[in-house]
């Protein structure tokens, strides 16, 4: 019932709102082109399509359904069809949170598991992203998050396949590549059969490449498959040379929104140099936490992925507003796994700052303040960026404590209310005493 209500709410929002216009026009146009011309003619010369082939198959199916039923672009049912798959994936993510909490060895109570599941199902960030904005981040995040859930269970090869599925959908999966590499390297030290674990690294890499290759083959053919895929992924990742692209993070708090990455930032260095330095620091932190947690027996792919995903969003350059979505969901999954109040707080805080971020960008689209240059929008960006950074710092404290010491801060237990004492039985009055 909980997940059914969450699905219904998303689909109702999809019907009564217009969606982010730039994404909507791309999704509809791509789906129509793929349905009409087929995959081999899709990436034609001069045609803008910055998505890899993975999710284009879903958009093509939407285009085919619209053509068969004569559904116009302006129809609300077009938005409904576009939001259907991501909405189902959002509900799958909420169910995954519940299953993770129930399987936790940290004593997550049924009430806590249900509350966390309800928050994930009705998360304001995900409701807005899927139901109003109508992006596909839920469909991208589900295989990516499930990959790290499987890594938590040491199911390395299925995890590699799911990472490949996420990579086939969006290039942003590459941001989590270092975490995947750390998990496979840690397996070499965690298992007795190190030769087998070492071979599994190569097997996992091959399996991770399989979904992008298979989904891209009809688009590019055998000869051009690998060169075209490399060009598609590198071109997409480098297509927005700005300090931050409406991402309310630490760089936005410093005034970097829509600033060219070559512009000066702090102490004479450019935004790009600052972002690269921050990426190195976050990656060094990932390596440190991984080594310490392996030695202590507290290695957790979910925890490391949450740290790295939010760390890159907070401190790196070229970030979009929605790049935080997988990191937020991973933080909620890590909270369900570790039952740590700091992780719960970070997940809730990041969800709220992400919602404010998306709502601000969406509300100003098509207005004179679309680039968020007004005093009000700039202030919102700075304050929200500071709030998001505070949530990341809280996340770091939790990761530091768990990775180094295996120490968690559980939710305070509420003592059950004790019933008032039953009064002692009173002596019965006799008729003689009553008449006295």
Question: For each predicted feature, which ranges?
Answer:
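Aromatic/glycine/proline-enriched transmembrane-helix motif characteristic
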Residues: 91-94, 103, 232-314, 400-406, ...
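Specific aromatic-rich, kink-prone transmembrane helix
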Residues: 96-99, 139-156, 330-331
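Transmembrane-helix signature of polytopic, membrane-embedded enzymes
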Residues: 72-77, 97-124, 154, 158, ...
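Transmembrane signal-anchor helices characteristic of membrane glycosylation enzymes that use polyprenol
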Residues: 1-29, 37, 83, 87-90, ...
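Membrane-interface alpha helices of multi-pass inner-membrane proteins
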Residues: 117, 128, 144-150, 157-181, ...
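Transmembrane helical bundles and short interhelical boundary loops of multi-pass, membrane-embedded
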Residues: 200, 224, 229-245, 251, ...
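Extracytosolic helix-loop segments that constitute the early lumenal/periplasmic catalytic or substrate-binding loops
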Residues: 23-50, 54, 61-72, 224-232
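Perimembrane helix-loop-helix junctions
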Residues: 176-210, 222, 326
């Amino acid at each position: 019932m909980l997940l059914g209500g969450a699905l219904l709410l998303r689909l109702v929002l999809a019907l009564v709102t217009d969606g982010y216009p730039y994404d909507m026009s791309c999704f509809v146009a791509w789906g129509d082109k793929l349905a009409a011309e087929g995959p081999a003619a899709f990436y034609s010369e001069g045609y803008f399509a910055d998505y890899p082939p993975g999710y284009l198959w879903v958009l093509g199916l939407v285009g085919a359904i619209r053509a068969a039923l004569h559904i116009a672009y302006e129809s609300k049912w077009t938005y409904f069809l576009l939001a259907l798959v991501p909405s189902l994936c959002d509900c799958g993510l909420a169910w995954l949170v519940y299953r993770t909490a129930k399987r936790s060895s940290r004593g997550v109570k049924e009430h806590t598991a249900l509350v966390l599941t309800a928050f994930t199902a009705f998360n304001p960030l995900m409701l807005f992203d899927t139901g109003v904005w109508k992006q596909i981040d839920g469909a991208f995040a589900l295989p990516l998050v499930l990959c790290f859930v499987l890594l938590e269970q040491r199911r390395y090869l299925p995890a590699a396949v799911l990472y490949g599925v996420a990579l086939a959908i969006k290039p942003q999966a590459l941001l989590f590549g270092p975490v995947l590499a750390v998990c496979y390297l840690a397996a070499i030290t965690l298992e007795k059969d190190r030769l087998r674990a070492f071979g599994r690294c190569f097997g996992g890499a091959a399996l991770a490449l399989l979904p992008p290759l298979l989904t891209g083959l009809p688009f590019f053919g055998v000869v051009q498959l690998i060169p075209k895929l490399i060009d598609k992924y590198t071109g997409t990742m480098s297509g927005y040379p700005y300090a931050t692209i409406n991402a309310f993070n630490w760089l936005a708090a410093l005034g970097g929104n829509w600033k060219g990455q070559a512009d000066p930032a702090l102490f004479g260095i450019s935004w790009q140099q600052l972002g690269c330095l921050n990426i190195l620091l976050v990656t060094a932190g990932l390596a440190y936490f991984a080594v310490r947690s392996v030695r202590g027996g507290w290695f957790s792919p979910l925890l490391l992925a949450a740290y790295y995903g939010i760390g890159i969003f907070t401190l790196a350059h070229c970030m979009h507003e929605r790049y935080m979505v997988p990191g937020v969901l991973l933080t909620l999954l890590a909270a369900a796994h570790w039952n740590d109040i700091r992780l719960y707080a970070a997940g809730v805080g990041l969800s709220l700052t992400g919602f404010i971020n998306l709502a601000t960008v969406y509300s100003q689209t098509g207005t004179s303040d679309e680039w968020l240059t007004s005093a009000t929008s700039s202030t919102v960006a700075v304050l929200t960026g500071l709030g998001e950074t505070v949530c990341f710092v809280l996340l770091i404290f939790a990761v530091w404590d768990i990775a180094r010491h295996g120490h968690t801060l559980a939710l305070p237990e509420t003592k059950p209310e004790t019933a008032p004492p039953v009064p002692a039985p009173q002596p019965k009055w006799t008729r003689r005493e009553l008449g006295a």
